[in-house]
Curated annotation (Swiss-Prot):
One of its GO terms (molecular function) is DNA binding. Keywords: DNA-binding, Transcription, Transcription regulation. It comes from the Bacteria. Belongs to the GreA/GreB family. GreB subfamily. GO terms for biological process: DNA-templated transcription elongation; regulation of DNA-templated transcription elongation. This is Transcription elongation factor GreB.
């Protein structure tokens, strides 16, 4: 089961997406569908078929967002988190080979588009490093075996609590 946590920034992005889809994109596509339908035969009408499919995708996403947003818990930065890895942290880690990675621990629904530097709180990597401090070592179980990592730095977006 996915964790129903989200950062303030993630919530705002999803709310903004909902508002854009509902107030701008859906009315625009509805007009196109209405126009294409008025042309007559819909069986070979590419404009109608394509935009009707797009309208269904928009409606599906809007339904999901309307159900998801009220159920989610927004997690803002708290000074008690400082110095340890918790939800919303930007963490830089390094392994013994010197490979360095930096990412943010977020809710599963925040990982979309080109958010390659986000990992889910539900991931084995995030779970393994929770509550760890800088210079601590942690182990992640992978199909190839256990992997050792060291925490180089931990940062939080402190302004998110003020937004």
């Amino acid at each position: 089961m996915k964790t129903k946590l989200i950062t303030r920034e993630g919530y705002n992005k999803l709310k903004q997406e909902h508002d854009y889809l509902w107030n701008e994109k859906r009315p625009e596509i509805t007009k196109i569908v209405t126009w294409a339908a008025s042309l007559g035969d819909r069986s070979e009408n590419a404009d109608y078929t394509f935009n009707k499919r797009l309208l269904r995708q928009i409606d599906r996403r809007v339904r999901f967002l309307r159900k998801f947003l009220p159920e989610v818990t927004i997690v803002d930065y708290s000074p008690q988190q400082e110095g340890k890895v918790f939800f919303g942290a930007w963490v830089e880690i390094e392994n013994e080979a010197g490979d360095v990675k930096k990412f943010r621990i977020v809710g599963p629904e925040e990982i979309y588009g080109d958010a390659k530097d986000y990992i889910s709180i539900d991931s084995p990597m995030a779970r393994a490093m929770l509550k760890k401090q800088v210079d601590e070592e942690f182990t992640v179980r992978t199909p190839e075996g256990d992997k050792e990592w060291f925490i180089n730095s931990i940062e939080y977006n402190k302004q998110s609590a003020e937004s």
